[in-house]
Design a protein with these regions (language model features):
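N-terminal amphipathic/basic-hydrophobic helices that include classical n-h-c signal peptides
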Residues: 1-13
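Contiguous surface segments at macromolecular interaction interfaces
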Residues: 10-57, 125-194
Length: 194
């Protein structure tokens, strides 16, 4: 059975099944996620607050038809428990990744975009040498942990970012404080069904 994420104005965000592998990834708020030229990053944690940069700045930078995405986490992304990956696998394919960020205007956590049919890595990996994540003005190598085809992905414009992600503490279901969330459990079925 296919379901949709709907915006408040009735636009379709992403068709999913309740049985699809879903990962919500919390990042800092940006307009384009294609570097900092003409854009900036707001929120997203203490590192961003201190340095005005985060590894997610290139999450929607088209690198020969591929997006290389980054979300920070403690330990590793648990692909074995949450996506039934084999124990010797370092990645899992066909995960729908929903990128979310806290709107700086105070209106809450919003969907900013998604990758469908993504590859999710258990640990951070180094980017290919011919990408902005590898060669950039910041003299840093920006690791990534999620990749997807550009054709299977969507970055929402600021005006399209109107779907609120429920807050587990306030709403009794939804995303908590962690940057990675798997939308598991009976209480969270509400979110998959909306």
């Amino acid at each position: 059975m296919r379901k949709n994420y709907l915006s408040s104005n009735g636009g379709i965000y992403m068709k999913i099944s309740m049985h699809d592998n879903i990962l919500f990834a919390k990042v800092g708020w940006m307009k384009r996620y294609d570097g900092l030229d003409g854009d900036n990053i707001k929120g997203g944690g203490s590192y961003i607050d201190k340095h005005n940069i985060g590894w997610e700045i290139y999450n929607f930078s088209d690198e020969n038809g591929i997006y290389y995405g980054y979300v920070t986490y403690q330990g590793c992304i648990d692909i074995h428990k949450n996506f039934n990956a084999k124990l010797n696998n370092n990645f899992v394919d066909n995960v729908n990744v929903v990128w979310v960020a806290k709107n700086p205007d105070g209106s809450g956590m919003k969907i900013v975009g998604w990758y469908k049919n993504a590859r999710v890595y258990k640990h951070y990996v180094n980017p290919p040498k011919n990408t902005k994540r590898y060669k950039n003005n910041y003299k840093k190598i920006f690791e990534y942990n999620i990749e997807a085809n550009v054709s299977d992905s969507k970055l929402l414009s600021i005006d399209e970012r109107n779907f609120n992600i429920p807050n587990a503490k306030n709403d009794g279901y939804g995303m908590g404080r962690a940057n990675v969330w798997y939308c598991n459990g009976d209480k969270n079925k509400k979110l998959k069904e909306n």
